[in-house]
Amino acid sequence: MAQDVLTDLNKVRNIGIMAHIDAGKTTTTERILYYTGITHKIGEVHDGAATMDWMAQEQERGITITSAATTCFWNKNQINIIDTPGHVDFTVEVERSLRVLDGAVAVFDGKEGVEPQSETVWRQADKYDVPRICFVNKMDKLGADFYFTVDTIINRLGAKPLVIQLPIGSEGGFEGVIDLVEMRALTWRGDSKGDVELGAKYDIEEIPADLQDKADEYRAKLLETVAETDDSLLEKYFGGEELTVAEIKAAIRKLTVNSEIYPVLCGSAFKNRGVQPMLDAVIDYLPSPLDVPPMEGHDVRDEEKIIIRKPDSTEPFSALAFKVAVHPFFGRLTYVRVYSGTIASGSQVINSTKGKKERIGKIFQMHSNKENPVDSVTAGHIYAVIGLKDTTTGDTLCDPQDQIVLESMTFPEPVIEVAIEPKTKADQEKLGVAIQKLAEEDPTFRTEQNQETGQTVIKGMGELHLDILVDRMKREFNVEANVGKPQVAYRETIRGTVDKHDFTHKKQTGGSGQFAKIQIKIEPMEVTAEKTYEFDNKVTGGRVPREYIPSVDAGIQDALQVGILAGYPMVGVKATLLDGAAHDVDSSEMAFKIAGSMAFKEAARKAKPVLLEPLMAVEVRTPEEYMGDVIGDLNSRRGQIQAMEDASGVKVITANVPLSEMFGYVGDLRSKTSGRAVYSMSFGSYAEVPKAVADEIVQKNKGE
């Protein structure tokens, strides 16, 4: 069966389950796997207990740990469920998961409606134009209110929901849904425990008499929305003709794929009610790989040259690695979304991001709780591959003869760091393993050894990012460690030019001495992602022997590592070696290296040194009533407001704010806006620190 499904991409859905942390994402995903498992194994006597055991174990470990993408089958269609990260602060990771999905199911808590975190995830999906259907979950919960939740989708998200189901009963009496497309009732009358075996079957009945008026009212709204998509449907509708189920579904699909509306369904995943119709809606309304625009990438040699790849097996092979995970038996698994072409196990491909050859080892499709080996990969699908040695998250794999880069991987430099000290020798070894594994998975995570203290310093994109990395070290790798306070990664530079600075290094202590004489010029230069320092040699007539010139450069580079104001690395400096002198016996590479380092330090003191700090590009989305407070708070943090605009029911404020002022911002924003505003933050640029603030930092560093 699997092979039949694979070839017809119209029958494939690559989806994510998006939700607030408590809206029931795990339970919903589990139930999807459970029901699709039953359907996939028709004719097999099912041992309910064994499946539930497996689900409980999954729940304990968290479903996202076992697999970043799970394949299941529903009514002869294939659904690949891609894990969407729970933390929206990691834009790189969120971007990547949203990039490999074609559609999503947004799960809402039927009592709480749209919560702040669901708002954040929703806005992120808006940004990438991901078509969605909404599942109002927990309809059996005390206080659950379907109509309230739909209102919050309109008011808090500014979205256009299209109600295609209504609940029958509520709280403890919730027993089914009214299907407004086919105008029928679906009921699950299992025992009080919501028996799963009974949950797998439901009855199709007449709409209850007491809900007929409500159903007619919402059906009329549905038909009106649907009829507006097409002139012939509009004519039919106003002519009093009945629209067919096929016509209604086709129109809802068209509107959903274009993100014009979001179909809303309801149920209780925990009580096994409403999950199967939701799966039907995934197939009926969410896009297949053929419904989304073809993939764009650029030429390996020319970033300006755009290349298009269609989801077709006749096109050259291209795929994006979107997750690297460690499997208990197979070791390193790389999850890939194949965008074009096909390739067999054992083939050689090229990692065009890094320019390295890779060999595809075993290929799996992850079927809920087991790996299903396949011989080859096909466009439009998600696979897990073994054997890729150099490929990390975000790399492109492609045909060596027809190369493409799908994602330009210029990751922002880390702006925040924290020292981490293992408690024991054993922890030190485990820390090494943890760092290596985490760096493979997360390209924005860096690490270095502090030469002076011997501590390991980990660097990341923000406070929350570091918290989660440290938490993962403890949880997944059992590293017990003391963690320091987060530190901002300041830099130093110069604003003035020193045209000539002479320095002589001379040491005579019996035997051969040390001698090096140099004259250098230093001046500011523009910092780019590729270049923060430049060295130029203008010595003529061999006054400094050629073999010693690289030593002067190396000495200056050493001095750049520890700035003269507060010991931070220096950037944006051009140094030119103008002149010098050497001694036949006493000169050496080491003597010229010391001279380079000392000359630079002395010259830099005269070149108007200044401190630089990372400025963050901050975007806050807030309901209008809190806008004044949010702007006032950003101003008090030395922020500069760049723009204010409207976006689907909220105000969007963009500002540049120094990172040092953003510690603890998440809590302050939550309290100022009752948890309704959300923000994202990414590195913008380095800027000069105001003198009063700089003096304080310099004093603090000298005091320590």
Curated annotation (Swiss-Prot):
Report domain tr-type G positions: 10-290
UniProt KW keywords: Cytoplasm, Elongation factor, GTP-binding, Nucleotide-binding, Protein biosynthesis
Q: Does the keyword Zinc apply?
A: no
Which residue windows are coiled coil? Answer: none
Q: Name one Pfam family in it.
A: GTP_EFTU
Q: Which GO terms describe its molecular function?
A: GTP binding; GTPase activity; translation elongation factor activity
Which SUPFAM superfamilies does UniProt cross-reference here?
EF-G C-terminal domain-like, P-loop containing nucleoside triphosphate hydrolases, Ribosomal protein S5 domain 2-like, Translation proteins
One GO cellular component this record assigns the protein to is: cytoplasm
A GO BP annotation: ribosome disassembly
The compartments listed are: Cytoplasm
Question: Per UniProt, where does GTP bind?
Answer: 19-26, 83-87, 137-140
InterPro entries, per database record: EFG_II (IPR041095), EFG_III (IPR009022), EFG_III/V (IPR035647), EFG_IV (IPR047872), EFG_V (IPR035649), EFG_V-like (IPR000640), EFTu-like_2 (IPR004161), G_TR_CS (IPR031157)
What function does the entry list?
Answer: Catalyzes the GTP-dependent ribosomal translocation step during translation elongation. During this step, the ribosome changes from the pre-translocational (PRE) to the post-translocational (POST) state as the newly formed A-site-bound peptidyl-tRNA and P-site-bound deacylated tRNA move to the P and E sites, respectively. Catalyzes the coordinated movement of the two tRNA molecules, the mRNA and conformational changes in the ribosome.
Protein name (Swiss-Prot/TrEMBL): Elongation factor G
Q: Which gene encodes it?
A: fusA
